[in-house]
Structures are given as structure tokens and as C-alpha cells.
Curated annotation (Swiss-Prot):
Keyword Flavoprotein: no
Family to which this protein belongs: Belongs to the heat shock protein 70 family.
Annotated InterPro entries: ATPase_NBD, Chaperone_DnaK, Heat_shock_70_CS, HSP70_C_sf, HSP70_peptide-bd_sf, Hsp_70_fam
Protein's UniProt name: Chaperone protein DnaK
Organism: Delftia acidovorans (strain DSM 14801 / SPH-1)
Disulphide-bonded residues: none
Classification via PROSITE patterns: HSP70_1, HSP70_2, HSP70_3
Amino acid sequence: MGKIIGIDLGTTNSCVAIMDGNTTRVIENSEGARTTPSIIAYQEDGEILVGASAKRQAVTNPRNTIYAAKRLIGRKFDEKEVQKDIDLMPYTISRADNGDAWVEVRGQKLAPPQISAEVLRKMKKTAEDYLGEPVTEAVITVPAYFNDAQRQATKDAGRIAGLEVKRIINEPTAAALAFGLDKTDKGDRKIAVYDLGGGTFDVSIIEIADVDGEKQFEVLSTNGDTFLGGEDFDQRIIDYIITEFKKEQGVDLAKDVLALQRLKEAAEKAKIELSNSAQTDINLPYITADASGPKHLNIKLTRSKLESLVEDLIERTIAPCRTAIKDAGVSVSDIDDVILVGGMTRMPKVQEKVKEFFGKDPRKDVNPDEAVAVGAAVQGQVLSGDRKDVLLLDVTPLSLGIETLGGVMTKMITKNTTIPTKFAQTFSTADDNQPAVTIKVFQGEREMASGNKMLGEFNLEGIPPAARGVPQIEVAFDIDANGILNVSAKDKASGKENKITIKANSGLSEDEIQKMVKDAELNAADDKKKLELVQARNQGEAAVHSVKKSLGEHGDKLDAGEKTAIESAVKDLEEALKGEDKDAIDAKTTALMTASQKLGEKMYADAQAAGGPEAAAAAAAGAAGASAGAAAADDNVVDAEVKEVKKD
């Protein structure tokens, strides 16, 4: 069985890790980085770019470059958080037929799970390249405060990417696994995980206990905000720059999509720089132009100004911390360690606020960008049976219940209940001779059902005629270890039963998922063809270069017919290289190698006469350069021109 990889599917950046024995390894991607930007770009020719390459071209292709898709996953178009993002994002967010928030790219509508699947596919490929074997199974992390619809949508993204998602695990819990695994302290420890990422905030209170030599990680409580993160901090900087520029130049950059994309990059860069310095310059020449000519932007931003811009955002993280402490039944003084997760926790003001609330310095020995992926890899090892000394007890973040008479939310499973769990309760009818009941399932903490998130509904029909209150209808809730809910209803008298696995009352249908899986497979096949074409082209170009060089140096040794044949073969290959036909390029490369054999023989003979066997061997190697280039295909060696451009 192959390894189960751990993936941190982040709003801003993603990361993949594996367990190698008892050692964790975060895997570098093809660009050599340990994290990959969660950015996807759709090119005019149909090519899909993921990660750093997508980020690099965002300024010139803002409408077709998707970032922060995780903020939309499992959400309805009408939700206020989505409506807020519509005004901020350069790409188009539209309503799908099922009411979900989807994204429009180059004339087609894409579901957020479909977009996130591109990032997951990149993570999968990164792991496969490192392991040298196919990867089909993964543990994927989600914010602890993700609801059922968002968790289901994340699983769908995994399926579309060709992964069997063995477990959905909460990000703070994964970070706790990464932190606690190598700690040798005896006795129980209570830790707080403060996770402020690119798009979401979570806090979890977790107890790590030694139980008969086994490390038990029990989540006592969790809380958070799934629409608060680094993207919001960036937006505050962008808004500030727009306001200042309008004051100075009288031009509103908010209406210029290309300028906004440059501002986003500059804001993120400034935010990162201000974690280490007191002041930074935001310098964007030719940001826009009007009738008077081009306009340049140059603004100084100090750390104190940034802190004043985002003060309320940082403050918003404290209320969930307070609630999590209360729900866990502990006091702040009971917390032994505070762990910071997510890139935003590098901001000094955030660290200061966390210290102020918890009364102690947060730990510095956890990598905020990598801990979540490492914890997911640990859980993968547990699920594969390769690790027996870890037990993870997670919780459901929000209460689950059904709507009863008068629109009341009757809670079946309360928040912070350890999962997996089951609960059943008996209900009855509201009217005489009622033949059916509709079970509406909600998630949330409000007393009235309408104030909570509706997850789904189904009917139980065929109830025998009886006075109101007489029929006995048992409703059962069953939450699995992924936090995904199954609900059933059964009439005890007739034995009639109905059940559903709760997806969003919209979500992706099975047919839609299967279509997306097929599309993804076609894309993978297309990518493979493109790679093979590039390899063939590289080898063809190497052959042309090698033969032309040798012809220039030794062509006078050939008779006219031989030289003409080689020149003709070179011309044919150069013509083939202009096209997209890999087979034609391969054939012309082979033809050139055959035609240039005489040239190789002449070079060998000349060298042997001049300097003996060693020189002859070197000459032969030079003449055979084209052949070697073609043979390299078998060894998966690709010649490529690489040019590094460094920006100040």
C-alpha cells in the first residue's frame, strides 16, 4: 500500500508532508519551495497554471487568476461573506444553478472544489515526484470551524484531484499533533492552538495525555471565524493605499483591475516586511495614467500605521479565544503552551495580543507554515496502521439539530462533542392524521432554526393515520470521524425509514463530481502530451545545434552529396520544430542523426590522425551529441533553457 500523504490546503498557501518511519518530511515542490501559493491561473490556450507560476502572471491576467477560493468552498452565493468578496476580487463570482457561489473564468463556470482540486493535484504530483510512486490517498486539513457543507466540498475537491480522502482533520488539531508528538514530558498538558491563516481563524484547546504509553490528543473545545485572515489584512492596506493615492493624485485605483492586482502583491509584500522592520516603501511606477500622463505610486507605510489599520481584525480573534476557554471548562492559567499557526501569526502585534490574553509567550518551536501538513501526515500514518501510539479525539465545532414546531432549533448534538458520535431522539406529528414529516437539519448555535445554517432536508412518508402526538418518529444523528453527518428518521409503528448523508442542500451532485474527475484526467493526459512535446523539441533543438556546429568545423571533409543530405535533414527538422507534432519531430531528429553519421566518422578519423584514441573518442562524443540528446529521453533527462530574472 502506498503512503497516505498529509495536505494542508490553505487559503493563501498549501503544503504537503509525509511520514518516513518516525520522521516527518515536508516535500519541496518543483520550484524548490516547501509551500505552494494556492493560486490557479487559466490561460487563453487552455493551460492551467498552479502556484508560483500562476502568481507571477496575476498582474497581467487578473480576471482569470483565482486566489482564496477556499473562502468560497461550500458557501451559498447569497451569504453576506460571499457578497463582501464579490466587490474585492478581480475575478467574477457568480451564482450557480444550485445557489452556490461559483467562479466564472473565460466564459465557463467553475465550482470552488474544482478550483481547489488543481492545488491538490499539484500537491499530489509533488509527493509522487519525491516518492517515485503513485499517491492515491490523503489526509486533508480544514479550519476547525468549517461547517458540514464546507467539509463535504473539501472531500469533493480531493476526489476531483484523484485522491481518496481518508480523513478530514481540523487544522489546529493537526498542528497539535505535530507539536506534541516529539515531546517527552510526562503528565497531561493543555495547549491552545491559535491559527490565523490566509482566510480563516481557529482556536482550539487540546489536552495531550499519556495513556499507557500512548499519546492521546483530546480536543476540549474549538471556535473561530471562517472569514477572517491574512487576505483581510491585505485588503486594509490596499484600501489605505487607494485612499492616499486618491488624495494625492485625484485618481481612484479601485476602478482599475490591473492596478488592484499590483496593489495586492505590494500590500502582501509590505505586510510581510513590516513583521521584521519598522517601515517599508510601497513603490509602484506607472500604476495608472490619465490625460496628464502616467502616474507613479510611492507611499511609506510604518508598522504602527499597519497596526492601527488592522487593530479591530486582531481584536476579533480574542472573542473566539474567550469562548473556547469557557467551553473547554478551563481557565487561562490552566493552559501550559500556546502554539501559533498560520503565516499571520508572524506579525508582532498578533503575538503581543496572544501573549496579553493567555498571559504567556507563545511557543517559537513550531513552524507556522508547515505544522498543519506535518500533523496531517502523522494522522495518515495512524490511519495506515503504521503508527499505534497516537489516539486523536476531535470534536464537532457547531451544534447540530432539527427544526421543530414553531421554527425552534432542537439540538441533537451540541458543539464540542467528541466525534465520531451518534444520538437519537423521538419526535411526533403536529397535526391529526399527518401522513408525512419533513426533517430539516441545521447547524449553529441560535435558538431559532432560521438563524442557523440549513444543511439539508428530507421527508419521511407513509406514516399511518393517527391523532397528533401519537406517532413515534425516531430521528438519529450519526457524525463520522470527518465531521460529516448522516441523519435518519424511522416511524416505529410502520417501520418506514428514510435517511440521507448530509451534503449542502446544494453542493455538487455525484454526476458533477464524476464529470470533473474525467475533466481532470483529460487535463492530466494533455499535460503529459505537452511535456513529451517539450522533451522532443529540446532534443531536436540540441541535435540541430550539435550538427550545425560540427558541420561548420568539419563540413569541408564531406563530399557535396553528403553535406547536402545533412543540410536538408537539418532544414527538415527545423521546419518540424515549428509545429506541434511530436512524432514528426522525433522522426526528423532520427533522420538527422542518420544523415550525420558520415560527419561523425570523418571527425573521428581526423581526430585519430591528430591526437590518438582519446581525442578520437572526444570527437566522436561531440558528433554523437544529437544521438545522446535523443537517447536521454529514456533516462527522463530534459534539456531546457533557464533564465533567472532577479527583481530589486
